[in-house]
């Protein structure tokens, strides 16, 4: 090889080495870029490209079929574009989040998002359950991650735009069948509803039975944390199979102001076009109208102004103004159309991604307070007088589709009898405007609405609501909604106070309300346990909201009920009630029997049990449920702090105490073990799943030859307790005088 050839070869090798080095450097940078955290805009791009676009739909012939059951549910009179979200709210919040996040790398890496997208693409989505999984992974999880960053950011915190937040899909717990014998406690309203809606003695279903709704349980709810630690609903959402909200018809359907009237009329008349293309469009419109109706009904009955339908390829973001119940505002979110194909620079289109729009939707909803208790009942009374339920028709739109000749021949009674469709509420009640759902003052909500009742017995809740309208008003005769029942605001009475009331002993001077309990300078309680329960029941019979409020619907609910704070107004006794629905009375009665077994442990190991009362009208709950029974108790305390070192030891001591009385708690949920500062110990609550057995009396235990046999007796119980707890129970048992063999024969 000549020198010239040698030089040429060396130069070529040098160039190749440089190229390899450059390639390795690029690959290293690419990997670093893939694995580093991302900025806000990068994260939106990755979520759309790798998650949203990963959705694969099954063939429609293999998809789930059937209509959404909406008969008996409220539906709006008008459907209008939510232009205030499109033009004001979304641009404002998108720019605000972009400003707060800036170029900081706060979100998960591109490689993590890609890996999740691969998992999503491995599964075909053909039903609501599959869409549920997709929405959680591709939309809800990223949205919650972005909101979490905002909640911890100082600027956002000062503006109070973003509290702690979570998506929750655990709404069906109270209607699901319990294990074992408690299965008899199932809510029977669905079965009775079906029976009421069957036609004739032969029990044949009506022609509309496929549309009949059986419950008001949405797929999910957006939960926000309150400053006091409570949790309230911000919005409601529901999943729909992608083929039930056909994206090719979404824009045209949601642009129809009288979509609901058209669909209801077609279904009532049982008429479909013979043209196959028109028939397909009409069926798509029916699916969309029913999906919107379902969420609209949830929004009304759960007391929120915001909701959305998630159907994989699209989101339908919804809003209702409490000053205009008959109008539903809708913003269709179609990312595939609005974002389009990926390009080098998506910046101007990233605001149209599903994640970006749902973030703005959530932030908008946080500026509105959910209605509850008395305000929810008032709102539902207005809704019942204003709205129609599927498949009733609104009077003034019933003939929109008729020709003049047909209109003149229509029954005159339907044109002139306006009273049937106007509010039956007292005129004075209209003077009070319900709480506005407008965002902060700096964000004008705009004028979304124009200037421009038959009782439904298909739902148990609706029937009870009608009863409330006929019953006495909690606010007086002249201004039914202008007066609000007094709410309990005092500190809880002490265990010693309420135990003294129950036992007929002296007042507890350490009770924060003792001055209200004392009459004529006496040291004794002014009432006994029996009269106390009677007076509480009479107070709640006058109004379920008088001296009573729900503590925390989402955070303080158990397997069968909710927690209420109550005050017996003349005497200042302040305590709690465990409220439940009609069909769970036997569970409360069973719990009362458990408290009776634990009588001498009340006020120390378990709360003081003060009896059971019935609320004739019921305390309204989100979703048109009613708490009609309450078990009255002393306030047990708070969840032990995470840094309480001896919490498990104290818990085991309390478990040992109730076991010795013949009670197996049966529910090891940590929420059932509360720290009581007054007694300096863990108190146990919620005995609806407890089992009773003969108590371990000292004489019976003395016949055991050795403590080991008692350990065997406890074995089944201790299998549900951690090893450390079990060892402590044994240690306590060995130290107990009951465990010492008797030498007296």
UniProtKB/Swiss-Prot annotation:
A GO term for molecular function: toxin activity
Localisation: Cytoplasm; Nucleus
Effect of residue 511 to A/S: Appears to retain poison activity while abolishing antidote activity
One cellular component (GO) term of this entry: nucleus
Described purpose of this protein according to its UniProt entry: Promotes unequal transmission of alleles from the parental zygote to progeny spores by acting as poison/antidote system, leading to poisoning of progeny that do not inherit the allele. May possess DNA nuclease activity that leads to spore killing, and a kinase activity that confers resistance to the nuclease activity.
Ranges where the record places region Disordered: 173-222, 407-487
Residue ranges that the Swiss-Prot or TrEMBL entry lists as coiled coil: 4-34
Highest rank taxon of the organism: Eukaryota
Chain intervals with Polar residues compositional bias: 208-217, 409-422
Entry keyword set: Coiled coil, Cytoplasm, Nucleus, Toxin
Compositionally biased tracts (Basic and acidic residues): 188-197, 466-482
Name assigned to this protein: Meiotic driver SPOK3
BP term (GO), one: meiotic drive
Alphabetized InterPro entries for the sequence: Kinase-like_dom_sf (IPR011009)
Species, as recorded: Podospora anserina
């Amino acid at each position: 090889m000549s020198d010239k050839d040698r030089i040429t070869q060396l130069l070529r090798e040098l160039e190749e080495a440089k190229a390899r080095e450059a390639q390795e450097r690029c690959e290293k940078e690419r990997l670093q870029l893939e694995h580093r955290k991302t900025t806000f805009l990068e994260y939106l791009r990755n979520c759309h490209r790798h998650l949203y676009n990963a959705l694969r739909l099954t063939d429609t012939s293999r998809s789930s079929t059937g209509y959404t059951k909406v008969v008996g549910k409220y539906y709006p009179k008008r459907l209008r574009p939510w232009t205030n979200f499109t033009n004001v709210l979304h641009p404002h919040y998108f720019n605000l989040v972009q400003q707060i996040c800036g170029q900081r790398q706060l979100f998960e890496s591109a490689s993590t998002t890609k890996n999740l997208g691969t998992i999503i693409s491995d599964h075909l989505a053909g039903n609501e359950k599959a869409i549920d999984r997709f929405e959680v992974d591709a939309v809800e999880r990223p949205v919650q991650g972005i909101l979490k960053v905002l909640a911890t950011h100082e600027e956002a915190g000062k503006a109070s735009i973003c509290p702690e937040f979570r998506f929750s899909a655990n709404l069906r717990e109270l209607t699901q069948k319990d294990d074992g014998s408690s299965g008899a406690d199932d809510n029977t309203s669905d079965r009775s509803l079906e029976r009421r809606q069957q036609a004739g003695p032969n029990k044949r279903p009506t022609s509309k039975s496929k549309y009949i709704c059986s419950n008001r349980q949405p797929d999910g709810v957006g939960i926000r944390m309150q400053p006091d630690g409570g949790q309230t609903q911000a919005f409601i959402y529901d999943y729909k199979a992608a083929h039930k909200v056909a994206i090719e018809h979404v824009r045209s359907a949601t642009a129809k102001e009288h979509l609901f009237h058209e669909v209801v009329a077609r279904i009532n008349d049982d008429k479909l076009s013979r043209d196959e293309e028109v028939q397909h469009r009409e069926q798509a419109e029916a699916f969309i109208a029913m999906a919107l109706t379902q969420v609209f009904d949830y929004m009304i009955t759960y007391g929120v102004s915001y909701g959305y339908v998630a159907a994989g390829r699209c989101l339908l973001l919804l809003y209702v103004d409490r000053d205009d119940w008959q109008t539903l505002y809708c913003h269709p979110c179609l990312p595939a159309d609005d974002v389009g194909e990926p390009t080098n620079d998506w910046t101007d289109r990233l605001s149209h991604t599903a994640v970006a729009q749902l973030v703005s939707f959530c932030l908008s909803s946080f500026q509105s307070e959910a209605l509850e208790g008395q305000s929810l009942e008032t709102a539902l009374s207005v809704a019942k007088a204003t709205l129609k339920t599927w498949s009733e028709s609104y009077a003034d739109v019933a003939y929109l589709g008729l020709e003049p000749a047909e209109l003149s021949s229509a029954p005159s009674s339907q044109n002139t009898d306006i009273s049937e469709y106007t509010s039956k509420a007292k005129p004075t009640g209209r003077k009070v405007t319900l709480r506005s759902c407008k965002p902060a003052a700096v964000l004008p909500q705009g004028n979304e609405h124009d200037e421009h009742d038959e009782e439904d017995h298909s739902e148990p809740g609706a029937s009870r609501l009608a009863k409330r309208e006929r019953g006495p008003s909690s606010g007086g005769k002249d201004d039914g909604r202008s007066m609000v029942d007094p709410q309990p605001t005092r500190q809880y009475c002490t265990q010693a106070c309420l135990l003294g009331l129950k036992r007929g002993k002296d007042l507890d001077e350490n009770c924060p309300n003792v001055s209200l309990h004392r009459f004529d300078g006496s040291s004794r309680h002014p009432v006994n346990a029996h009269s106390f329960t009677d007076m509480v029941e009479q107070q709640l019979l006058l109004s379920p909201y008088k001296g009573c409020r729900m503590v925390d619907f989402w955070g303080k609910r158990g397997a069968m009920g909710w927690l209420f704070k109550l005050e017996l107004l003349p005497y200042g006794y302040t305590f709690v009630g465990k409220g439940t629905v009609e069909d769970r009375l036997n569970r409360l009665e069973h719990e009362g029997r458990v408290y009776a077994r634990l009588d001498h442990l009340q006020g120390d190991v378990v709360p003081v049990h003060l009896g059971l009362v019935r609320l004739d009208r019921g305390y309204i709950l989100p979703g048109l449920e009613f708490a009609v029974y309450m078990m009255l108790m002393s306030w047990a305390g708070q969840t032990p702090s995470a840094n309480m070192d001896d919490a498990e030891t104290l818990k085991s001591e309390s478990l040992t105490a109730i076991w010795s009385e013949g009670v197996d708690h049966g529910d090891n949920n940590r929420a059932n073990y509360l720290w009581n500062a007054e007694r300096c110990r863990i108190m146990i609550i919620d005995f609806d799943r407890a089992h009773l057995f003969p108590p371990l009396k000292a004489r019976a235990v003395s016949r055991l030859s050795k403590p080991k046999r008692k350990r065997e007796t406890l074995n089944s119980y201790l299998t549900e307790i951690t090893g450390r707890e079990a060892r402590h129970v044994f240690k306590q048992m060995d130290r107990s005088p009951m465990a010492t063999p008797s030498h007296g024969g």
